[in-house]
Amino acid sequence: MSGSFDRYVSFKNCDWKVRSERVMARLQRHIDAAENPFWAYFAQKRTELREKQGLDDLRVLHNYLPTLRELLEDNGDLETLAMLEELEVNLM
């Protein structure tokens, strides 16, 4: 099999990339606030996973879904939590 494989072919017309970027943009607020050591770790792992393994934001979010969900609930960030859960239900 030659060429690249698009593992998101079933997500055609779902805007998964834009939706993932929106969630990451909202998570950036938590990363910048640095109120929990996890956020620095998450930012570092995101960079590593993207650069070294070629993973996109949807996959990075999926890798940390339970922790992200818990922290967003604890912080009362229900809007970002809803966006994350929508990604989970529709695209993960």
Swiss-Prot record:
Any single biological process term in GO: nitrogen fixation
InterPro entries assigned: CowN
KW Methyltransferase (keyword) present: no
Keyword DNA-binding appears in the UniProt entry: no
Keyword annotations: Nitrogen fixation
Function: Is required to sustain N(2)-dependent growth in the presence of low levels of carbon monoxide (CO). Probably acts by protecting the N(2) fixation ability of the nitrogenase complex, which is inactivated in the presence of CO.
Family: Belongs to the CowN family.
Name the record gives this protein: N(2)-fixation sustaining protein CowN
Organism encoding this protein: Rhodopseudomonas palustris (strain BisB5)
Phylogenetic lineage: Bacteria, Pseudomonadati, Pseudomonadota, Alphaproteobacteria, Hyphomicrobiales
